[in-house]
């Protein structure tokens, strides 16, 4: 990389730029002389973010254009939210680094109410995540769960304009944008199980680029990698069979991976949960085992 500018492909959203800047700062910490440039790109998913349409944004819509930039050598690395990586990577690309995980929980955000249990019957709560909708409806079937699209700023404005009584957002996104004051409650995973990879920044690059792989290696966080490996195995297995709400969340306890997962119906009328523990080197295997268990129980 001597005398070369390392180009970081990123989405154009404020949060994506913030995450790319975090990677920029970490790389500069380990490689002070490295020249780095951010390369913001509008993705297919971004184009439809603010459209209140019934059409679901396709898988991979937030990363496809960034991957094209890597494949075409216009960028050296791409920075993603791990939860956006819902499709297999192209053969020529790899995901060598998962940065240390931020808070993986969801946040309850409201201008009037301290938590979801204090919302009056018929209150409108906003989220477009099927995972959140499913679990919220199961817990509070008397609420109106309404789709909520747009970036974080747009969603907060819709709350402020009174379109919603409350909304649910990822804690990590609010923290990165210095919007902690909006968080009324950090929702415990036992009450709202997080998405695969929530709170994790992932770095993608070309598989055969030894120089880049070497530069990125100090940013690799092993514990996060074990956790996401287990979580991703669940979603990879289940998404090949169905398009239902899925959640998977792993923690490490005493050198073991503790994985919780669920699958349900969007209306919350049916949720199947499971959990298990395994040695760290069997994290992925545990994910596949639990996913199979969920599918069998769900079909009964």
Swiss-Prot record:
Enzyme Commission no: 2.5.1.61
Cofactor note (record): Binds 1 dipyrromethane group covalently.
Pathway connected to this protein: Porphyrin-containing compound metabolism; protoporphyrin-IX biosynthesis; coproporphyrinogen-III from 5-aminolevulinate: step 2/4
Cofactor (UniProt): dipyrromethane
Listed GO MF terms: hydroxymethylbilane synthase activity
InterPro entries: HemC, Porphobilin_deaminase_N, Porphobilinogen_deaminase_C, Porphobilinogen_deaminase_C_sf
Catalytic activity from the UniProt record: 4 porphobilinogen + H2O = hydroxymethylbilane + 4 NH4(+)
Keywords attached to this entry: Porphyrin biosynthesis, Transferase
Pfam families, alphabetized: Porphobil_deam (PF01379), Porphobil_deamC (PF03900)
Additional observations: The porphobilinogen subunits are added to the dipyrromethane group.
Assembly mode: Monomer.
Name of the protein described by the UniProt record: Porphobilinogen deaminase
Top-level taxonomy: Bacteria, Pseudomonadati, Pseudomonadota, Gammaproteobacteria, Enterobacterales
Gene: hemC
